[in-house]
């Protein structure tokens, strides 16, 4: 049985997304991307764009489940608030599309893919490439999309079929 997982790295300016399939203990890369909103847009328009794009991703790729990064302590309150706003729009979109989702902290994600919760972003990308059987020079759409793929792998590791 194949499980298709949508990983989401939320943000107001950039929402990373990644789709992979899991069959047994093997992962297969499907697609990754980034939804970009611009600061000149109103908050309403930014959140609507994020939701609309997530709907298209869900409709096009038909994931079985989603995983999204949980809010963690942030030094910058403004950033934490904007990420929370984007997360709210994304989670509502999951609910409207009847898509189950799970939340993971950055440390859970890093620990799940590497066995160590404090690895650097460059190491995360390296591990993702190995786990997904990618060439070493594969270029992700963005740092956000590679984080989203890590979230999808994390979910697959925590929910073994």
UniProtKB/Swiss-Prot annotation:
<dbReference type="InterPro" id="IPR036397">
    <property type="entry name" value="RNaseH_sf"/>
</dbReference>
<feature type="active site">
    <location>
        <position position="9"/>
    </location>
</feature>
<dbReference type="GO" id="GO:0008821">
    <property type="term" value="F:crossover junction DNA endonuclease activity"/>
</dbReference>
<dbReference type="GO" id="GO:0048476">
    <property type="term" value="C:Holliday junction resolvase complex"/>
</dbReference>
<comment type="function">
    <text>The RuvA-RuvB-RuvC complex processes Holliday junction (HJ) DNA during genetic recombination and DNA repair. Endonuclease that resolves HJ intermediates. Cleaves cruciform DNA by making single-stranded nicks across the HJ at symmetrical positions within the homologous arms, yielding a 5'-phosphate and a 3'-hydroxyl group; requires a central core of homology in the junction. The consensus cleavage sequence is 5'-(A/T)TT(C/G)-3'. Cleavage occurs on the 3'-side of the TT dinucleotide at the point of strand exchange.</text>
</comment>
<feature type="active site">
    <location>
        <position position="144"/>
    </location>
</feature>
<feature type="binding site">
    <location>
        <position position="9"/>
    </location>
    <ligand>
        <name>Mg(2+) 1</name>
    </ligand>
</feature>
<keyword id="KW-0963">Cytoplasm</keyword>
<keyword id="KW-0227">DNA damage</keyword>
<dbReference type="GO" id="GO:0006281">
    <property type="term" value="P:DNA repair"/>
</dbReference>
<dbReference type="InterPro" id="IPR002176">
    <property type="entry name" value="X-over_junc_endoDNase_RuvC"/>
</dbReference>
<keyword id="KW-0233">DNA recombination</keyword>
<keyword id="KW-0460">Magnesium</keyword>
<feature type="binding site">
    <location>
        <position position="144"/>
    </location>
    <ligand>
        <name>Mg(2+) 1</name>
    </ligand>
</feature>
<dbReference type="GO" id="GO:0006310">
    <property type="term" value="P:DNA recombination"/>
</dbReference>
<dbReference type="InterPro" id="IPR012337">
    <property type="entry name" value="RNaseH-like_sf"/>
</dbReference>
<dbReference type="Pfam" id="PF02075">
    <property type="entry name" value="RuvC"/>
</dbReference>
<comment type="similarity">
    <text>Belongs to the RuvC family.</text>
</comment>
<keyword id="KW-0378">Hydrolase</keyword>
<comment type="subunit">
    <text>Homodimer which binds Holliday junction (HJ) DNA. The HJ becomes 2-fold symmetrical on binding to RuvC with unstacked arms; it has a different conformation from HJ DNA in complex with RuvA. In the full resolvosome a probable DNA-RuvA(4)-RuvB(12)-RuvC(2) complex forms which resolves the HJ.</text>
</comment>
<protein>
    <recommendedName>
        <fullName>Crossover junction endodeoxyribonuclease RuvC</fullName>
        <ecNumber>3.1.21.10</ecNumber>
    </recommendedName>
</protein>
<keyword id="KW-0234">DNA repair</keyword>
<dbReference type="GO" id="GO:0005737">
    <property type="term" value="C:cytoplasm"/>
</dbReference>
<keyword id="KW-0540">Nuclease</keyword>
<keyword id="KW-0479">Metal-binding</keyword>
<keyword id="KW-0238">DNA-binding</keyword>
<feature type="active site">
    <location>
        <position position="69"/>
    </location>
</feature>
<dbReference type="GO" id="GO:0003677">
    <property type="term" value="F:DNA binding"/>
</dbReference>
<dbReference type="GO" id="GO:0000287">
    <property type="term" value="F:magnesium ion binding"/>
</dbReference>
<keyword id="KW-0255">Endonuclease</keyword>
<feature type="binding site">
    <location>
        <position position="69"/>
    </location>
    <ligand>
        <name>Mg(2+) 2</name>
    </ligand>
</feature>
